[in-house]
């Protein structure tokens, strides 16, 4: 991916939510299930580029699709010589006695940007001092957290933002259906929302805009899972139309500048 500073006429577009995996590996994969006829196949960066490049998408932040610790390294190895992969949001369990050691191990790689947790682990971290300390380690390392869950999780996201102001948090797969985003999240500048929830309506996007504004919304496709909803072209085109109507400045923020602030990915 060319340096952003050199792309004045043609801005980069960064997809902050893709998954890569290979069931043909000797060890297989923990996800997706063999019973999923759409997703259970080898999905690698070259496959993503085939659907994304025609729309001007220049890079991606890969999000974990495996609870196996060594699969963090598997993605980092994929990214080593592939400049379209800007980084990984990995998987580490705050309940693990090895969390600190694994975090230190992976944080040495500049492409390791943070981890993803679902609603239950986030709630447990807020209640358990040891697990909470592990999330603070994440912030102290300059890394971030992707949060995935239902609307009920958002109260805990706000609590976490209050207790660890240095931790950048990206809420995955919004808008929810029906749209539901607490206005209180507007007060936390370190909390971002990733529009990766399928084909949101204008009203749903308006609600997100009212809470996060032009500085804290980021683009993510959720490919290849998004194929269950619509082709990549449709997913992209839906948000492209909405944010283009907001003007060039807002559009650039949505498609790459905000994600750079949230993930601290660097051009390669």
Where are these regions (language model features)?
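Mid-to-C-terminal alpha-helical segments outside catalytic/metal-binding sites
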Residues: 1-16, 41-59, 207, 213-218, ...
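Active-site micro-motifs of SAM-dependent methyltransferase domains
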Residues: 20-22, 176, 200, 225, ...
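N-terminal cationic-hydrophobic initiation segments that often serve targeting/anchoring roles
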Residues: 52, 79, 107, 161-162, ...
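Short alpha-helical
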Residues: 69-70, 97, 152-155, 234
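Catalytic pocket-lining loop regions of alpha/beta-barrel enzymes
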Residues: 113, 127-218, 229, 267
């Amino acid at each position: 991916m060319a340096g952003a500073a050199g792309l004045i006429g043609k801005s980069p577009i960064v997809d902050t939510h893709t998954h890569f995996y290979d069931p043909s590996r000797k060890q297989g994969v923990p996800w997706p299930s063999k019973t999923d006829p759409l997703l259970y196949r080898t999905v690698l960066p070259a496959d993503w580029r085939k659907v994304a490049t025609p729309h001007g998408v220049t890079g991606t932040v890969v999000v974990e699709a495996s609870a196996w610790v060594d699969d963090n390294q598997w993605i980092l190895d994929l990214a080593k010589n592939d400049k379209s992969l800007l980084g990984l949001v990995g998987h580490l369990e705050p309940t693990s006695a090895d969390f600190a050691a694994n975090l230190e191990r992976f944080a040495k790689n500049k492409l390791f940007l943070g981890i993803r947790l679902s609603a239950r682990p986030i709630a447990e971290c807020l209640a358990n001092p040891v697990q909470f300390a592990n999330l603070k380690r994440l912030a102290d390392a300059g890394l971030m957290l992707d949060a995935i869950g239902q609307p009920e999780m958002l109260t805990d996201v706000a609590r976490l933002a209050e207790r660890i102001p240095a931790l950048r948090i990206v809420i995955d797969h919004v808008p929810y259906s029906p749209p539901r985003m607490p206005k209180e999240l507007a007060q936390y500048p370190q909390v971002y929302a990733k529009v990766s929830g399928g084909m949101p309506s204008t009203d749903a996007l308006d609600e997100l805009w009212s809470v996060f504004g032009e500085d804290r919304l980021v683009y993510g496709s959720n490919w290849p899972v998004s194929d269950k909803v619509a082709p990549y072209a449709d997913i992209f085109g839906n948000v492209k139309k909405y944010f283009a109507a907001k003007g060039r400045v807002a559009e650039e923020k949505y498609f790459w500048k905000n994600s750079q602030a949230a993930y601290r990915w660097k051009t390669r």
